[in-house]
């Protein structure tokens, strides 16, 4: 499945005319959506596998399909759509995303459920596919802020109680909002616009601070808000709490659920902050536990008695040790669950190192128990685990009258949240840098990403395409490896990460490096998911600015010897010159590399005539573009740098009225 649009599945698109159907068909193919058309359109529309016909009135048809889709795309007048859907609307937490396109494909309108349903995001995904204008009217979007009611969604946070409408209104007015964040990623804080209304933490003694008009709690604790207070509040709950459970065989789901609720209530912990359940491996088939995890969509991690016994706990039990081979189950499992969360680099699926994981109510086929350290490592592991994790609630015993079984519960706090999301890597080629030279698929992928990572120059060139709430990380030109590592880290966390390269990402770009790094990490080829979006390469861009120099066999050679020995580069230059290829030279010269181009020209002069045509193109399609047509013997007189591509023609290449032309048939 195409990774773009997965979160909206299933998606429906509705057309009422042949024109609308033809507009929607390629969109449906890209997003794997179902296209619904009326009966009379069958004769004029090429029916594909994802096209369905409705025979009733559209009003009645909508009643039937409304509950079945998470997003519905209409190509219809917006007023007509409003009248059609108004009887079906419940609230923003249950309604599907509703997006409207005009039949000309000029505008994409986020009509309903912009935040919770994702209509705003879907609008930004669709607009580049049509080269259309996205129409989003929400206040947070216009302020370039993430919607407060979807702020934690990329990180898997759970939305808690509070007056969300009032707080959203205060943010829309630009009034000061206090943010008290006790847990979870602070990435979002680092990527806010310069002018934002948030004030973080409490003021220091003697420090002047604005009076907040609202407050946002980001915490694993459960705050009780009085509705009478003048200061409206909301709360997000990062999933950082690991619940260790030990139980008798046959303990019921009801007892487990009631016990966890009671313990959390007693200690003022938020049930929504639960990351997962952890226990001993002999409980991997415990029906009550499995049913509870499935109902709550929580991962279940199991550990061997040997590993659990390595954990220093406050309440060890010799009785438990005699029964299952470890002095602690609940406390040790909670600590290990939390420790594993911060040590696994957030990898969803855990490389087959955990027991069945419930993802969206389904059991992932993952039968391996958590990987054990080697025997010689156990004592060192025990030393590390002593201080590794904060045990918030020590072992509590719980029974429930009328229910079979008994359980012990402990709760540990992980440093980093469990997102519950499968991360994605979108490797994007942005083309030469001018936005209209970027493919619509690449623009769509960029819009879909939670995070964008790239060289600072390339990031600046595509800045107009970024959306509010996106995390954008710039890095220097020499930090390609760090960019790749950072992207993989964030994707393993569960985020959708776009890694941008100029030109084509698979030609001297980041795609190869990222895939190399994934291979080195024993990537399973599935998690994180990877999709590559090609772009117009630098040699294509340069060629288009000077004519048609690549009409016969050609090759590309980089003169950078940072990763390739010069001896290898020299052999390739000789071979290309001897074979009379048209040659595109990348990375011809830098501040520290000045001799390579001189040597390359010398090699070509041994096999080509001095008057052999050469094009020198710097920053094609950018504001500071420079183009020079010259001859091989004059090439060293032209200023070049790392943003330059040099095109050396073959013996048949010529210059005609300042156009460089290589004949289709070889004449040399």
Q: How does the language model describe each region?
A:
Residues 92-147, 280, 289-329, 533-539, ...:
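Long, charge-dense
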Residues 349, 361, 376-377:
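Glycine-biased, low-complexity coil/linker segments
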Residues 126, 130-194, 566-613:
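Conserved anion/nucleotide-ligand pocket segment
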Residues 2, 7-26, 32-77, 82-86, ...:
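Class I S-adenosyl-L-methionine
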Residues 260-274, 437:
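Phosphate/pyrophosphate-binding loops at sites that engage ATP/ADP/AMP, CoA/4′-phosphopantetheine
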Residues 212-229, 235-236, 333-343, 387-416, ...:
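C-terminal edge-of-domain segments
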Residues 184-210, 220, 318, 425-427, ...:
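A contiguous loop/helix-start segment that scaffolds small-molecule binding in enzyme catalytic cores
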């Amino acid at each position: 499945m195409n990774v773009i649009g997965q979160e909206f599945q299933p998606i429906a698109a509705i057309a009422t005319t042949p024109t609308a159907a033809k507009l929607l068909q390629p969109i449906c193919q890209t997003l794997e959506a179902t296209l619904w058309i009326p009966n009379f359109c069958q004769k004029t529309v090429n029916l594909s596998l994802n096209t369905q016909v409705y025979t009733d009135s559209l009003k009645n048809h909508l009643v039937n399909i409304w509950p079945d889709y998470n997003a519905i795309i209409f190509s219809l007048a917006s007023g007509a759509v409003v009248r059609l859907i108004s009887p079906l609307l419940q609230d923003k937490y249950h309604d599907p995303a509703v997006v409207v396109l005009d039949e000309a494909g000029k505008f994409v309108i986020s009509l309903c459920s912009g935040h919770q349903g994702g209509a705003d995001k879907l609008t930004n995904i669709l607009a580049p596919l049509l080269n259309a204008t996205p129409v989003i009217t929400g206040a947070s979007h216009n302020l370039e802020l993430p919607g407060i009611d979807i702020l934690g969604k990329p990180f898997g946070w759970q939305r808690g109680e509070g007056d969300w409408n009032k707080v959203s209104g205060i943010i829309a007015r630009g009034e000061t909002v206090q943010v008290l964040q006790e847990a979870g990623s602070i990435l979002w804080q680092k990527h806010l616009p310069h002018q934002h209304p948030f004030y973080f933490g409490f003021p220091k003694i003697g420090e002047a601070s604005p009076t907040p008009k609202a407050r946002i709690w980001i915490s694993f604790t459960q705050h009780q808000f009085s509705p009478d207070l003048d200061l409206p509040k909301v709360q997000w709950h990062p999933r950082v709490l690991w619940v260790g459970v030990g139980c008798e065989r046959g303990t019921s789901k009801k007892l487990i659920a009631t016990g966890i609720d009671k313990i959390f209530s007693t200690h003022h912990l938020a049930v929504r902050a639960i990351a997962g359940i952890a226990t001993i491996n002999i409980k991997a088939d415990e029906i009550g536990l499995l049913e509870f995890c499935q109902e709550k969509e929580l991962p279940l991690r199991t550990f061997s008695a040997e590993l659990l016994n390595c954990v220093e706990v406050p309440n060890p039990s010799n009785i438990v040790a005699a029964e299952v081979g470890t002095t602690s189950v609940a406390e040790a499992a909670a600590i290990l669950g939390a420790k594993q969360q911060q040590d696994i680099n957030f990898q969803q699926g855990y490389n087959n190192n955990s027991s069945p994981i419930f993802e969206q109510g389904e059991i992932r086929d993952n039968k391996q128990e958590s990987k054990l350290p080697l025997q010689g490592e156990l004592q060192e592991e025990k030393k590390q685990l002593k201080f590794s994790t904060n045990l918030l609630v020590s072992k509590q015993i719980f029974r429930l009258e009328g229910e079979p079984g008994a359980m012990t519960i402990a709760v540990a706090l992980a440093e980093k949240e469990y997102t519950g999301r499968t991360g994605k890597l979108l490797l994007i080629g942005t083309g030469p840098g001018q936005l209209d030279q970027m493919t619509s698929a690449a623009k769509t992928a960029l819009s879909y990403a939670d995070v964008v990572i790239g060289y600072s120059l390339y990031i600046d060139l595509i800045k107009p395409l970024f959306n509010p709430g996106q995390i954008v990380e710039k890095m220097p030109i020499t930090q390609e490896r760090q960019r790749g590592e950072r992207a993989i880290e964030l994707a393993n966390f569960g985020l959708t990460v776009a890694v941008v390269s100029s030109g084509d990402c698979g030609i001297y770009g980041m795609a190869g490096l990222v895939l190399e790094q994934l291979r080195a990490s024993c990537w399973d080829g599935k998690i994180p998911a990877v999709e590559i979006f090609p772009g117009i390469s630098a040699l294509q861009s340069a060629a288009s600015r000077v004519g048609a120099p690549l009409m016969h066999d050609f090759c590309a050679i980089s003169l950078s010897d940072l990763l390739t020995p010069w001896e290898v580069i020299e052999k390739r230059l000789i071979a290309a010159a001897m074979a009379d290829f048209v040659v595109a030279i990348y990375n011809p010269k830098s501040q520290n590399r000045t001799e390579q181009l001189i040597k390359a020209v010398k090699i070509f002069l041994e096999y080509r005539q001095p008057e052999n045509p050469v094009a020198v193109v710097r920053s094609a399609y950018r504001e500071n573009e420079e183009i020079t047509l010259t001859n091989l013997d004059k090439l060293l007189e032209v200023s070049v740098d790392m943003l330059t591509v040099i095109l050396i023609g073959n013996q048949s290449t010529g210059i005609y009225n300042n156009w460089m032309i290589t004949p289709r048939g070889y004449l040399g």
